Amino acid sequence: MLLTRRAALKSVAVTSIGALTGAVAYGMGNERHRVGLTHATLPVSGLPPALDGLRIAFITDVHHSLTVPADDVTRAVMLANSTDPDLVVLGGDYVTGLDHHYVAPVAELLRPLHARDGVFAVLGNHDDDREMPAALMRNGFTVLKDQRTRVGLRGEALEVAGIRFWTRRPDEIARVLRDARDTTLLLAHDPRRVTEAAALDVSAVLSGHTHGGQVVLPGIGAVARRDFPVLAGVARRQNTSLFVSRGIGTVYVPVRINCPPEVALVTLQRLSDL
């Protein structure tokens, strides 16, 4: 049978639409709930030998809501605890759109998280500045709002600093990090803050916010891309190392394609020659 050009194009279009529909259906019904554990090695310049191999369980962008159920959050907590980490870090966006109905529930779901040397949290752009931090603190988390704390571990010290999402000016960030003498880990929801961190010679940054792109199409890449240094994984800016997690939840559309949710176990690796 002779196939006309119009018929061929129609066939390709139908096939493409069918494939996309199938991918979206899978992303809505399966992939967005398949929370997994990933491992990342983060090279850190000047890391003391005693802190080489320090393990940090990192959870971010939970977005607990009608479309991100308690079961997903509970699985993330279970995976983090299974790693027996030195530190636990939460990277912000615990709810979506400042929805106060989920503030107390998500903090309680995260409460079982534990680590030998502390559990720390920062806020994201979907978190309010009062209810969310109060709920986290009630459940045992140290919430860093443009603050820094010195953590003693393995006979050494690690400066853990955290900034609000809207803290962006170099002088504001410099104020948080002023007089930091030890290796500094900056918790910043937005990975674009690595620019300011690198200018201040911060050792390492942990971020979320990007969701890894959330929808990543073959041959196209992430649909929602901005000027992020990296959408997911490890990057380096001057002497500052950055890790960006894909996070747990979703926003805008309850779908993930080629971008599964993750709990990240980040292991610090000493780079003494940098």
Regions found by a protein language model. Give the residues of each.
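N-terminal secretory signal peptides and thylakoid transit peptides that target proteins
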Residues: 1-19
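C-terminal segment of N-terminal export signals and the immediately downstream linker at the start
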Residues: 20-54, 67-70, 75-78
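Beta-strand-turn-beta hairpins that frame and shape the catalytic cleft
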Residues: 44-56, 149-160, 236-241
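Active-site-proximal beta-strand elements of phosphoester/diester hydrolases
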Residues: 53-63, 157-165, 185-189, 241-246
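Membrane-embedded segments
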Residues: 54-134
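Active-site neighborhood of phospho(di)ester-bond hydrolases with catalytic His/Asp-centered motifs
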Residues: 59-60, 88-92, 118-125, 144, ...
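Binuclear metal-dependent hydrolase catalytic cores centered on His/Asp/Glu-rich metal-binding motifs
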Residues: 131-134, 138-141, 145-147, 152-188, ...
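Conserved beta-sheet core of the metallophosphoesterase superfamily
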Residues: 191-267, 271-273
